[in-house]
């Protein structure tokens, strides 16, 4: 039997067959993994190595009417307290909070604590403890709703298991943070913290504290603090909706708990435009936790660019001249004075400038807060929109229009000033010139009465016109009611029998004649006075006062909104009435106000006022408009304890000159390349 001469060749063929089969199987598996199930496997790989992260959109910028950037953004760091890592270990959470508080106290850092209870050795509930949202918090946590401060604090200590090793003062600070965390796993503890504090946080000793990047506000001006406003973390009472008041909380608006929101001013008023839409991204990491890539599944959209009606150059002049005028009134109580000024564009209601004195610096607001709160001059109080003052003789313009339009008098009607008004047995008020010099203004018409500010003339005209008609015209001028300004204001008081009855006050015939000269119960804001004059010199077109000019997308590529409201009402003041009233205002600038208005670059009209607020103490009021023959701007200035309104004439001239000598070029708003993501 012969042997196979080539046994090795057969083995080669067998091995080659096995190898080919292996290759076929390998490529089949590879095809299945890469092609058939490729997308599924890639998704599984990403899921196992990535985490989804919210990318906070930067807040929109704010500009003046000429595009000059007033508020923008910069990169900053925030501290977020997250209780989820503590589980049910209340003691560890409280200890971590206390360590963080001690660090912040050491570094002089303020943190977000809106619990309506004072801090210190004997914490006391504040007036905010009466709000519906806080009462709801107490109910939800079965805390005493009618207990005293000590009882509420003790109950909160028990609720959050704050042990007896902490004093009441320390416990108050801890429960303040626990209050913020109620109903949520984390909250923004502090914003825009220093790099020094960050270094302390990152040493690993502060459990439950994370550092996040955020866009902090940059204030490119020290002006308009009361207009621009501030931003801050969402407070507990802002988070929840309140059905009883109709308030819609940020939770129901789609916000994240740690978002920054506007707290006051235009930051709050235009929150819907300034707040951007957050993005989402997937962060890919390796086995060591090192980031190896990122994928944006939704790009963040920065907030819109809000252009205000304010002219920041005019705002500078208004703030400076108001401050120098008040500071120049040298006497023992000059430091107690405050004041406000407003400038409105005639025929639109646009607020061109608005100042309140004293003011503050938004850039250092958080650091200065404690001192600002203690300042008895109330620098955070916006006197232009929240302060109410008797208008004094500036109200005589309204009385003049009412009497002329109703046919009570004509432009040529003569009334003789007899010094003491004796129509009533009581009261029998005197004209100011009789009280001061024992003389009278003689026989005068309405234009002359405006120049002389003759009280006797307006006592008689007020009596003849009656309070019903006076109030009808005052209301049409917008006095005693909100101006509609977006940052909010108070209505003030329009004197009337109905108001007096509703507030348990007396109303007599004497109230009517004193109301006619701007006294009685009349109390208006400086912004109301400016809008009243703007309405008057326009012939009666009454507009809402407003700060919004337009809103554009963050890259200025499209217009989102433009203010476009027409007049609220129109008095349709007759030409003869307009001529008589504006003649009086114009003549005044050539009479007792000549020294101030001699340097005015355009012809103007004005009216002074002085309102008694105590024995030998009076607030000074002043209104003006320009130009005389084609009104463009209206001005109101009020100075507490300012005496005669004539002392404010120079400030008004400064404002008029600034407006009519401006170059009007403005600046270009920042484009998208100037914005953060």
Please annotate each region the language model reported:
Residues 91-98, 102, 195, 199, ...:
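Solvent-exposed, polar/charged alpha-helical surfaces in well-ordered, non-transmembrane soluble domains
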Residues 1-274, 278-299, 332, 339-340:
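Membrane-proximal periplasmic segments of bacterial cell-envelope enzymes
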